[in-house]
Structures are given as C-alpha cells and as structure tokens.
Design a protein with these regions (language model features):
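Conserved eukaryotic protein kinase-like
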Residues: 2-231
Length: 231
C-alpha cells in the first residue's frame, strides 16, 4: 500500500506541480492543514453552502470559534493551476475588499481552501431574480453604491497596491462576497495572473484555447486592446 502511494505521487502531475510550487515559495503567510483537520473543521462536511464546478463549499469552525468557509476541490486531471493561483495570490494580499485566505490543505489528491466566512453569501443572489437562491432582501441604492465602490477599491489594490500586479480575470457577481454589513470582498482567484508592475500588456490563452492580448491601466503605452468576453 505504501509503495502504491509513493508511485501515485511520482506519476501524478498535479501533485508534482503543487509540491514544486510549495517548495519554491518557502513559508507562506497562510497555515497549511492536514485533511483530517479539514474534516474536523467542517464536522465531516455536515453543513454544505454550495456546489460548483470546482467542488463543494462547506461551513466550518476553527478551534478558536471563528467561522470559516471551506472550499473542497474536486480531484482533477489538470495541473493544479487554479489551486496554485488561489494560494499564491491571496496569500500576498491584505485588504478590506479582498477575501482572506485563512489556510489550505494539500495532501496527495486532497486539496482544500479555507476562507473567512461571509454571512450574506455572494452578490449574485441579490441581483438575479432567476437565481433559485434569491432572497427577499432588496439592496438599496446606497448599499449597491457602496458595493460598487468597494469592488473598485479592491481591484485598484490588486493592480497597484501589491508588490506585483494581480489580474483577476473573473470579476462577476458570483465572485463578490458580502459580509454581515454588506461590505464586498473579491474572491475566487483561480484564473488570476501575476505580472510585474511595469508591464501593461499580457498575452494569454483563454479557456477555449484562443489567445488574447489584454491591456489595462498600467504605465506603458497601449495602442491595441482586445478583451475576451465571457457569456
């Protein structure tokens, strides 16, 4: 059994990619948990908050009594890039409008991310009537304005407030979480790109395999802008 486990680690590309990343980045600003800890924190995944293509989201509680949201990722044939993006980017940030990553788990094929708990969930359920989880609370114009300003401040921090520029690439209502006072926090950094501060144009390959040239408000000159549109 032990021999089989070692063979799996050696042959699994995702495991090797994540292991190499953690080794090259040294100590991170967030705590690393064992999978057994994740089960204790979530009370064996008792309280499920949601389900997505990434896996399941569960409510949990740390030993100090702090409530958290635990994203348990599906086992994937990919190279673990989205998991690495989450750990690498959020661990670099500290801002009132960016969700806090409180820890992560990487144990063989098991991967999980632990975030601060946002009682009001995502902005999506408050603005889309067709959403099955739609709530009866109507957000006033002042609240919506404050949410928009908060999102803008969070993006400005990612672009200009960190040592490197962090480009989110997936800003949408589902990825904007709201705390108990409806203050917005940007979440879900799976598609994030990190690039030098002096760079204003980046070339990347989209999810459909098409390449895009993306420009934003950096210092360099831009003559051509082409943005991918997600429908």
């Amino acid at each position: 059994m032990l021999s089989s486990n070692k063979s799996w680690k050696k042959e699994n590309p995702t495991y090797q990619n994540v292991k190499a990343f953690l080794g090259s980045h040294g100590p991170l600003g967030t705590r690393r948990y064992k999978y057994s800890d994740i089960k204790k924190i979530t009370n064996s995944f008792k309280d499920k908050l949601g389900q997505g293509g990434y896996g399941g989201l569960y409510k949990g509680k740390l030993q100090d009594g702090c409530f958290v949201a635990v994203k348990v990722l599906k086992e994937s044939k990919g190279n673990g890039e989205e998991f690495l993006n989450e750990v690498a980017t959020i661990s670099r940030t500290s801002h009132v409008n960016i969700v806090t990553l409180m820890g992560f788990c990487f144990e063989e094929s098991k991967r999980a991310l632990i975030y601060e708990f946002m009682p009001n969930g995502s902005l999506e359920k408050f603005i889309y009537k067709e959403n099955p989880s739609n709530v009866d609370i109507q957000l006033g114009w002042e609240t919506l304005y404050n949410i928009a300003v908060g999102i803008g401040r969070g993006l400005e921090y990612l672009h200009k407030g960190c040592n490197t520029q962090i480009l989110h690439f997936d800003i949408k209502p589902h990825n904007i979480l709201l705390d108990e006072n409806f203050n917005p926090k940007i979440s879900n950094f799976g598609l994030t790109k990190i690039c030098p501060r002096e760079k204003s144009i980046i070339s990347m390959v989209g999810a459909q395999g098409r390449s895009h040239i993306v420009a934003w408000g950096g210092r360099g000159p831009c003559k051509k802008k082409k943005f991918p549109i997600r429908l």
